[in-house]
């Protein structure tokens, strides 16, 4: 199936880098009567995408859509031929760039016109394929770029610490590391990210679990869970299964 589906990533312009993590594209041309399940683990990021060949509920067939932070595994089944070109925002980046409230977008896909101005969405709607995606997105989003606020820069600092230091297992440890109070941290995540700091930290550590298993970890799953902050094995198994689709033991055996 790999020869029929192509996933690529590209950098955005330096002007947009404070808000946009990267661009990504998916192209497919599947044989008749076949389908491909595209699965994505939850990340604390919103996406702005132009989609051709995919039908989304609730967007009135508008190809330019915004998908908020998804709190469970995100599955899309593709058939026939089509493509997607998208901007993946940094955690909090969409809200910081547009003024949208991230919590309102959590676990939903909406027409981009509900978040962006008509000039931006019209420019993206004219995109005819993935080849010109980078330039089109750069040009469309550049008009929104301003100077990042101090609050947003503080949020990015916190997110960077969560990502870089695998030993951070509790929100209190993050607060101490970054010198941020509990109320301030909760307010930043509520406003910009749309989910709690605890949820984001837990997702990052679960991504670390998957990374270790993909690298061939052969030790005890209880030890691996405890390493990343889960001391209740049943809780760890439920969270892993909800996100990955199979229990951690089955995933570990499959990766060996």
Model regions: which residues?
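Alpha-helical bundle regulatory/interaction domains
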Residues: 1-182, 192-197, 211-216, 220-231, ...
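General helical structural elements
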Residues: 76, 187, 191, 207-209, ...
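DNA major-groove recognition helix of helix-turn-helix
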Residues: 189, 201, 240-241, 252
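Extracellularly exposed regions in secreted/surface proteins, prominently low-complexity, repeat-rich
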Residues: 235-239, 246
């Amino acid at each position: 199936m790999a020869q029929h589906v192509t996933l690529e990533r590209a950098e955005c312009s330096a002007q947009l880098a404070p808000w946009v993590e990267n661009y990504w594209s998916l192209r497919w041309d599947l044989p008749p009567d076949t389908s491909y399940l595209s699965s994505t683990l939850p990340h604390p990021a919103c996406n702005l995408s132009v989609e051709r060949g995919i039908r989304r509920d609730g967007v009135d067939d508008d190809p330019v859509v915004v998908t908020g932070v998804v709190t469970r595994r995100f599955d899309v089944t593709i058939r026939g031929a089509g493509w997607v070109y998208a901007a993946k925002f940094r955690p909090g980046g969409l809200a910081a760039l547009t003024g949208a409230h991230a919590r309102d977008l959590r676990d939903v896909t909406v027409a981009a016109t509900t978040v962006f101005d008509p000039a931006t969405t019209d420019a993206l709607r004219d995109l005819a394929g993935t080849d010109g995606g980078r330039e089109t997105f750069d040009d469309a989003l550049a008009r929104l770029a301003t100077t990042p606020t101090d609050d947003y820069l503080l949020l990015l600092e916190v997110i960077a610490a969560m990502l870089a230091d695998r030993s951070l297992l509790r929100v209190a440890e993050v607060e101490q590391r970054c010198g941020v109070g509990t109320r301030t941290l909760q307010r930043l995540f509520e406003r910009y990210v749309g989910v709690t700091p605890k949820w984001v930290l837990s997702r990052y550590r679960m991504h670390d679990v998957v990374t270790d298993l993909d690298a061939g970890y052969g030790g005890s799953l209880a030890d691996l869970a405890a390493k990343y902050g889960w001391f209740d094995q049943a809780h760890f198994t439920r969270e892993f299964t909800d996100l990955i689709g199979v229990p951690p033991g089955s995933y570990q055996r499959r990766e060996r």
